[in-house]
Swiss-Prot record:
Sites of the Glycyl lysine isopeptide (Lys-Gly) (interchain with G-Cter in SUMO2) crosslink: K179, K262
Lineage start: Eukaryota, Metazoa, Chordata, Craniata, Vertebrata
An annotated Gene Ontology molecular function: RNA binding
Annotated region described as Necessary for interaction with PPP1CC, given as residue ranges: 393-408
GO cellular component: chromatin; chromosome, telomeric region; nuclear body; PTW/PP1 phosphatase complex
Listed InterPro entries: TFIIS/CRSP70_N_sub, TFIIS/LEDGF_dom_sf, TFIIS_N, Znf_CCCH, Znf_CCCH_sf
Originating gene: Ppp1r10
Single Gene Ontology BP annotation: positive regulation of transcription elongation by RNA polymerase II
Name the UniProt record assigns to this protein: Serine/threonine-protein phosphatase 1 regulatory subunit 10
Length: 872
C-alpha cells in the first residue's frame, strides 16, 4: 500500500464491490482479486483488515479457492515475519485465520506452517498465543488422523494390483532390463556400505531373529506374514519395488522370477536356509512394538542387497580363463547392455597387465552374477537364442569375437605407487639423515670445485652483432599533450629529483671524536664584577632567591659550590682574588684515577690544603665585621642586597626589637665569634647558649646545619637565579643560624619563615619567633632567661615546623603573618631542604670521587661541605 498511514475504513470502501454487507467475500472471483491485493500489503493495518475479511467468509468454495491461489503460502510468509518480529497481535490473527481455513494433510505438507505453529504452542511467551496455537495443533492432528484412517484400505487395493501385475509381467520382460533396473535401484546402496561390513552383519541379524523369536510362536507364521508387511509399509513409507521382492520371496510355492534367483548361484545353500529362517520366524516379538516390527520386516530387501554384494567381491577377483593371457575382468560397476559388440568400455578399469591380444573379449552380460560354468564357455560356441533360459531362469552366457576390422589393441601400464608421491616430503628420520649426507657431500664438492676457481674468463668475450632495426613508423609521444600538462604542473610544484648514488658502497664514516661536554659555570666570570641586581620590594615581599634557576641543570653539589665561588669573586673581599672553578674541583676531588678517595682522606695535609684553598675565597666563613655592621651593611663591602625600610622593620643593630630605628633591613647578621671551628659555632654561638645582646643563656641548644653554599659576607646571586633550592641567602653564618640579635636567613630552601620583628630564619624551616629572638636551623630554640631583645621579651618558644613546599614559578612570593612590629615572613619557592649533620657518618665515596652523588640530599652518607662541615 502507500507509504502514508492507512485508514481501514477507506480500505473497506475500496473493497466494497467484492464484499457483502457482513464483510464476507461474495464470489470466487472476488477472493482472487483480494488475494492479489493481499500480496502487496506491507502495513499491519491492511494485513489485519484482509485477515478479518477471510475470517468473515463462510463459503467453503471461496476458502478453498483462496488456498489454491496461494493464500496458504502467503499466510506462511506472514507467520514467519510476525514470529521473527515477535508481533503477538498479528500472530493471533494469523492463527485464527489458519484455524478458519479448511486445510488438508497435503496443504500442511507444503511448507513449515505446522512446525511454526507447534513451536508457538510450546515456546511462546504469551499465554493466550500458546493456547491458541495448541488448539490449532490439536485440530490439525485430528485432520491428519481422520485422513490417514481412510487411506490404508485404498493403499491395500493398489498394492495388491501392483503385486499381481508384477508377477505376470516380470517373466515377459527382457532379462537385461530386469538387471539394469535392479542395478539402478541398488547403486546408491553400494556406495553407502562396504561389502565386508554387510557380510558380517547379515548373518548376525538372521541369527538374532532365529534364536529369539523361533521358540515363542512358530505356529503364527503364515497368519501374520502378509499383515505385518502391509503395516510396516504404511509406517515407514517403503517403496513398492522392495514390496514386490518381498511378495515374490514370500510365497515359497510360486515360481521365483529370474531377478530374484540371480543372487543365489555362488552361495546357494546358506542363503536359501537363511531366507527360509526369515520366513519361518515371526516378525513381531511378544511385546508387539513397532520398532521391532521395523527390525523384522524392513531388512528383507536389505538382505537381498547384501547377498548381491557378497557375490560382487568373489567375481571381481576371479580370473577369466580366456586364452590364459588376459587379466581379470573387473567390470562390476558398469551397467550391462544387451549388445555383445561393445568391447572397449569394460576394459578401461584399473588393472595391471600386458598388451591385450588381438582377440577381444565381449562384455559379460552380468559379471556380478556370472556362474563359474558360464565363464568356461568356449569361443566357438554360437550365441544361442536370446530368449533361451537355463534351468535356473538365467540367460546362457556366450562369447563372440567381432570382425577383423573392428579389433583393437590396448596397452595397459601398471601404476607405480610412488608415481604421485611428493618426493620433497621427508618420510622418516633415515631418509632425513640420508638427505643430509647428500647435501653435505654436495656442499663439499661445490667448495672444492670453487676453491680452484680463479674467476678467469673461460670463453672470450665477443661483442654481439648490432641489431639493425627499421625506423619507427610513429614517433612515440609526438602528438601527446601530456608533456605540456606536466610542464604546466611542474611550474607550481617542485620537480621530483631522484639522485643516484655515485657507487653502491656504503658512504665513508664521518670522522667524529667524542668530546666531553663543557662545564658552564652557574655564575659567569664576566658578570661577577658588576653590581648585583637590586630589587625593590614591599616590606612583606620576598627576598632574593638563594640559588639560581640554572642550578637545577647541574647536580646540587656542583651548583652550590660553583655559586659560592662565583659569589665570592663579586665583593672582592680582603685577600680575595680570581679563582678557577676547575682548579677547585680538581683540588677537592684530587686525582680519582690514581688514588681512591679513602687514601685521600687519610693524608694528613689533605684538610689543610682544603682550608688554605677555600678560606681565602670566603667559602668557609663570613668576613670580619666592618664598622660594627655585618657584611653588606653601611661599612661593609658593596653589592649587598638591600631591602627597603618597612614599617617597624628590624635593624640588624643592637635595637632589633619593635622600637628599633627604621633603616635598611639587611639579610646578613653579624657573624658569630670565630673562636671555634670557622664552619661551626664556637662556645660563643648565641644558639648554643652563648651570650647574646640580652644576656647570657643557659646550656647549649640543638644546632642544625642548613643547606646551601653561601654564607658570610657573600651576597646572594642576582634575582634572575631565584627559585632554586639550596643556598643560604643573606649574610648569615655558614651554618644557617642567626647571629646575636639579628636575622639569620630568610626563606632559605624554599620555605616560609614566620618571623617576628627582628626574627631570623634558619635553614629553610618555619620558626615562630618573638621580638628580638633568633631561631636556629628550624628547631625549637631552648633559651634561658635574659635571651631576647633589649626590652626583655622572652622569645616565643615554638616547636619547629617543617616547611611546606611551595611549588610555583620562581617569582611567586608568599606573604605571611606579621609578628610584633609588622615584620612579615617571606619565602621563596624551591625544594625541601632537609639539612642535618651527617659528619658522624661515613663519607660518601661517590661524592668524593666524582664530586656528586646521584642520591644528592637523600644520601645516607656524609657529603663534606653539603650535609656537614668540610673535612678538616
Amino acid at each position: 500500500m502507500g507509504s502514508g498511514p492507512i485508514d481501514p475504513k477507506e480500505l473497506l470502501k475500496g473493497l466494497d464491490s467484492f464484499l457483502t454487507r457482513d464483510g464476507e467475500v461474495k464470489s470466487v472471483d472476488g477472493i482472487a482479486k483480494i488475494f492479489s491485493l493481499m500480496k502487496e500489503a506491507r502495513k499491519m493495518v491492511s494485513r489485519c483488515t484482509y485477515l478479518n475479511i477471510i475470517l468473515q467468509t463462510r463459503a467453503p468454495e471461496v476458502l478453498v479457492k483462496f488456498i489454491d491461489v496461494g493464500g496458504y503460502k502467503l499466510l506462511n510468509s506472514w507467520l514467519t515475519y510476525s514470529k521473527t518480529t515477535n508481533n503477538i497481535p498479528l500472530l493471533q490473527q494469523i492463527l485464527l485465520t489458519l484455524q478458519h481455513l479448511p486445510l488438508t494433510v497435503d496443504h500442511l505438507k507444503q511448507n513449515n506452517t505446522a512446525k511454526l505453529v507447534k513451536q508457538l504452542s510450546k515456546s511462546s511467551e504469551d499465554e493466550e498465543l500458546r493456547k491458541l496455537a495448541s488448539v490449532l495443533v490439536s485440530d490439525w492432528m485430528a485432520v491428519i488422523r481422520s485422513q490417514s484412517s481412510t487411506q490404508p484400505a485404498e493403499k491395500d487395493k493398489k498394492k495388491r494390483k501392483e503385486e499381481g501385475k508384477s508377477r505376470t509381467t516380470l517373466p515377459e520382460r527382457p532379462l537385461t532390463e530386469v538387471k539394469a533396473e535392479t542395478r539402478a535401484e541398488e547403486a546408491p546402496e553400494k556406495k553407502k556400505e562396504k561389502p565386508k561390513s554387510l557380510r558380517t552383519t547379515a548373518p548376525s541379524h538372521a541369527k538374532f531373529r532365529s534364536t529369539g523369536l523361533e521358540l515363542d510362536t512358530p505356529s503364527l507364521v503364515p497368519v501374520k506374514k502378509n499383515s505385518s508387511t502391509v503395516v510396516v509399509s504404511d509406517k515407514y513409507n517403503l517403496k513398492p519395488i522392495p514390496l514386490k521382492r518381498q511378495s515374490a520371496t514370500a510365497a515359497p510355492g510360486d515360481a521365483a522370477p529370474p531377478a530374484e534367483k540371480k543372487y543365489k548361484p555362488l552361495n546357494t545353500t546358506p542363503n536359501t536356509t537363511k531366507e527360509i529362517k526369515v520366513k519361518i520366524i515371526p516378525p513381531q516379538p511378544m511385546e508387539g512394538l513397532g520398532f521391532l516390527d521395523a527390525l523384522n520386516s524392513a531388512p528383507v530387501p536389505g538382505i537381498k542387497i547384501k547377498k548381491k554384494k557378497k557375490v560382487l567381491s568373489p567375481t571381481a577377483a576371479k580370473p577369466s580363463p580366456f586364452e590364459g593371457k588376459t587379466s581379470t575382468e573387473p567390470s562390476t560397476a558398469k551397467p550391462s547392455s544387451p549388445e555383445p559388440a561393445a568391447p572397449a568400455e569394460p576394459m578401461d578399469t584399473d588393472r595391471p597387465g600386458t598388451p591385450v591380444p588381438a582377440v577381444e573379449v565381449p562384455e559379460l552380460m552380468d559379471a556380478a552374477s556370472s556362474e563359474p560354468g558360464a565363464l568356461d564357455a568356449k569361443p566357438v560356441e554360437s550365441p544361442g537364442d536370446p530368449n533361451q533360459l537355463t534351468r535356473k531362469g538365467r540367460k546362457r552366457k556366450t562369447v563372440t569375437w567381432p570382425e577383423e576390422g573392428k579389433l583393437r589393441e590396448y596397452f595397459y601400464f601398471e601404476l607405480d605407487e610412488t608415481e604421485r608421491v611428493n618426493v620433497n616430503k621427508i618420510k622418516d628420520f633415515g631418509e632425513a639423515a640420508k638427505r643430509e649426507i647428500l647435501s653435505d657431500r654436495h656442499a663439499f664438492e661445490t667448495a672444492r670445485r670453487l676453491s680452484h676457481d680463479n674467476m678467469e674468463e673461460k670463453v672470450p668475450w665477443v661483442c654481439p652483432r648490432p641489431l639493425v632495426l627499421p625506423s619507427p613508423l610513429v614517433i612515440p609521444g609526438s602528438n601527446s599533450q601530456e608533456r605540456y600538462i606536466q610542464a604546466e604542473r611542474e611550474k607550481g610544484i617542485l620537480q621530483e629529483l631522484f639522485l643516484n648514488k655515485e657507487s653502491p658502497h656504503e658512504p665513508d664514516p664521518e670522522p667524529y671524536e667524542p668530546i666531553p661536554p663543557k662545564l658552564i659555570p652557574l655564575d659567569e666570570e664576566c658578570a661577577m664584577d658588576e653590581t648585583p641586581y637590586v630589587e625593590t620590594l614591599e616590606p612583606g615581599g620576598s627576598g632574593g632567591s638563594p640559588d639560581g634557576a640554572g642550578g637545577s641543570k647541574l647536580p646540587p653539589v656542583l651548583a652550590n659550590l660553583m655559586g659560592s665561588m662565583g659569589a665570592g669573586k663579586s665583593p672582592q673581599g680582603p685577600g680575595g682574588g680570581g679563582i678557577n672553578v676547575q682548579e677547585i674541583l680538581t683540588s677537592i676531588m684530587g686525582s680519582p684515577n690514581n688514588h681512591p678517595s679513602e687514601e685521600l682522606l687519610k693524608q694528613p695535609d689533605y684538610s689543610d690544603k682544603l682550608k688554605q684553598m677555600l678560606v681565602p675565597h670566603g667559602l668557609l666563613g663570613p668576613g670580619p665585621v666592618a664598622n660594627g655592621f655585618p657584611p653588606g651593611g653601611p661599612g661593609g663591602p658593596k653589592g649587598m642586597q638591600h631591602f627597603p625600610p618597612g614599617p617597624g622593620g628590624p635593624m640588624p643593630g643592637p635595637h632589633g626589637g619593635p622600637g628599633g630605628p627604621v633603616g635598611p633591613r639587611l639579610l646578613g647578621p653579624p657573624p658569630p665569634s670565630r673562636g671555634g671551628d670557622p664552619f661551626w659555632d664556637g662556645p660563643g654561638d648565641p644558639m648554643r647558649g652563648g651570650p647574646m645582646r640580652g644576656g647570657p643563656g643557659p646550656g647549649p641548644g640543638p644546632y642544625h646545619r642548613g643547606r646551601g653554599g653561601r654564607g658570610g659576607n657573600e651576597p646572594p646571586p642576582p634575582p634572575p637565579f631565584r627559585g632554586a633550592r639550596g643556598g643560604r641567602s643573606g649574610g648569615g653564618p655558614p651554618n644557617g643560624r642567626g647571629g646575636p640579635g639579628g636575622g639569620g636567613m630568610v626563606g632559605g630552601g624554599g620555605h616560609r619563615p614566620h618571623e617576628g620583628p627582628g626574627g631570623s630564619m634558619g635553614s629553610g624551616h618555619r620558626s615562630h619567633e618573638g621580638p628580638g629572638g633568633s631561631m636556629g636551623s628550624g628547631h625549637r630554640s631552648h633559651e634561658g632567661p635574659g635571651h631576647g631583645g633589649p626590652h626583655g621579651h622572652r622569645p616565643h618558644d615554638v616547636p619547629s615546623h617543617r616547611g611546606h613546599d611551595h611549588r610555583g614559578p620562581p617569582p611567586h612570593e608568599h606573604r605571611g603573618h606579621d609578628g610584633h612590629g609588622g615584620g612579615g615572613h617571606r619565602g621563596h619557592d624551591g625544594g625541601h631542604s632537609h639539612g642535618g649533620d651527617m659528619s658522624n657518618r661515613p663519607v660518601c665515596r661517590h661524592f668524593m670521587m666524582k664530586g656528586n652523588c646521584r642520591y644528592e640530599n637523600n644520601c645516607a652518607f656524609y657529603h663534606p661541605g653539603v650535609n656537614g662541615p668540610p673535612l678538616p
